[in-house]
């Protein structure tokens, strides 16, 4: 058990297993990008990156320049693609730290080229095409082809790749995704007819890695499946064996017997119906255990489920342990993960919150220590 009152346990052996599975289902010849943005979906970017690279990933993906710089400062030398927006003021950091940058407007290409010229280097770029997601990217079409061809001639830019992102690959109906992919391929064909070649063409996200091998091209981008979670309930889970890497745990801080009619937590929204036992756990919404789990969430203590009672506080939450004999201060409580024969999954927590498993792991805040199992 950890020395901390609350901690997130990250099983790097699970990450290593998942990257092996991702490699197994990825088409031969396609590289694997491990997407480690948002502190590796809450799991710890440095440790996950090192584990993924050791397991066969060739690239890393981040959302922001600062995330890429942090990886470089940790001694990670693998190629890193900044998938999102970078300000003109940060362009020099892209060059200095040998990052690759997503480009999706003329202005972005120009300020990156200017920064590269000042540094006496070339900027590595991946052009982003919007084939139906509605986020960043040139809208696929003749106008985009003309502009990309023009910008690719800038001597300060080294064109490494071109990519798009699927909006609904995790749906059972793949028609929209295949339409997006067709637009992407048609645009690449037009660019190639005009003499522009791309070392790396990439489109496949986690769901497409699992179910659409024809979209794997030169590289795939593994996000949520790297962490052992499935993209949705509509994908075929039999295609890949995943192991969840994160558990959220705490130690029981206090246990007290309370009478019937006793009110618990802010707003007095919960009243005991009979005499019972309430345990306090030292985590709350400041740790990423959402207030929306008030009187909805559960914890595992002694391998049994204890319901959250009353409102989740900033730093504490109360659970009813009346039906669990012998609970005492210092006992382990599991908010996400397995204890004994019971499991509370990130998907279960997400369902109670009306959200997705991605958000559940990302919500675990920075003040929660990560404890790594190697």
From Swiss-Prot:
One of its GO terms (biological process) is D-alanine biosynthetic process. Its EC number is 5.1.1.1. It comes from the Bacteria. The active site is at 37 (proton acceptor), 266 (proton acceptor). GO terms for cellular component: cytosol. The modification N6-(pyridoxal phosphate)lysine is found at residue 37. It catalyses: L-alanine = D-alanine. Pfam families: Ala_racemase_C, Ala_racemase_N. Catalyzes the interconversion of L-alanine and D-alanine. May also act on other amino acids. Belongs to the alanine racemase family. This is Alanine racemase. The lineage of its organism: Bacteria, Bacillati, Bacillota, Clostridia, Eubacteriales. The gene is alr.
